[in-house]
Amino acid sequence: SFQGKKLYAGLVDAYMRKLLVEGFTLEFFIEGGRSRTGKLLTPKFGLLSMLVDAALLLRNRKVRFVPISIGYERIIEQKAYVEELSGGDKQKENIGGLLRTPAILRSRYGRLYVQFGEIIDLEQEKAGVLGSALEDAGAAALSPKQRRALVQRIGHRVVYEISQATIATPASIVAMALLDHSRRGLSHQSLHETCKILLAALQRFGARIAAVALDEQGELRDDALREAIALFLDGKLITKHETEEDPIYEPVSDRRLALEYYKNTIIHFFVPSAMVFSALALQPSRSATRAALRAQVER
């Protein structure tokens, strides 16, 4: 945090201006830290505000923001996250300590996914704030209110593009299927069918699906499902009950928060439909025109 540290803030500001002038790429984390729930955090504007201020003073140099989504099939810190969400103290992050734990080195963590969202152009966003494209307009063309609006516009746009670029993995789909049903456990066949339904919905919503999850026809691969199940079994997030017909998978009761993390990485894709269904449920006749639903959703 830069609060109360004017010298530190000034040095960082000057350093970023120097890097921009010389054409270097800058990396920063718009959320300000790691999400403990799997849901995207609201944008933090401190560094972004400094970067925008510096960029507005440049001439003859295009500045663009590249949203990047980094997703994990299984996270190393899941135990610490669950403890924090359950009311425990936040532990200082120390990757060295994690890697020295024997269980960490023996466990499987699956794949890591890096995806890029739509590139955001500073000049275009500035034109959106001003209402028209102004050539060679620097910081002087923006009032303090407009500058704040520009920073917030870019920050929220970056987070949105990251959310749209997030990969739906077999693990996230399996977690959602296991948590969002009325029974305690699901047979392998029922789990497969539920995951197929969720996959079809995600495809309709335009979500990016992990290539490993799909066969040549775009259908859910059973071995991808089994691999996700194996990751959760290895992490002791679910239990497997053998039966004569089909194994049954059940979330471990005190590890549900960990499963929620993986479910939450894709839950935002379902929000628009959920809002429409909620608006429809509020209609007395359970039917409404498109205009009435839009008005209800936008309230």
Q: Where do the model's predicted regions map?
A:
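Membrane-interfacial terminal anchoring regions of lipid-handling membrane enzymes
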Residues: 1-299
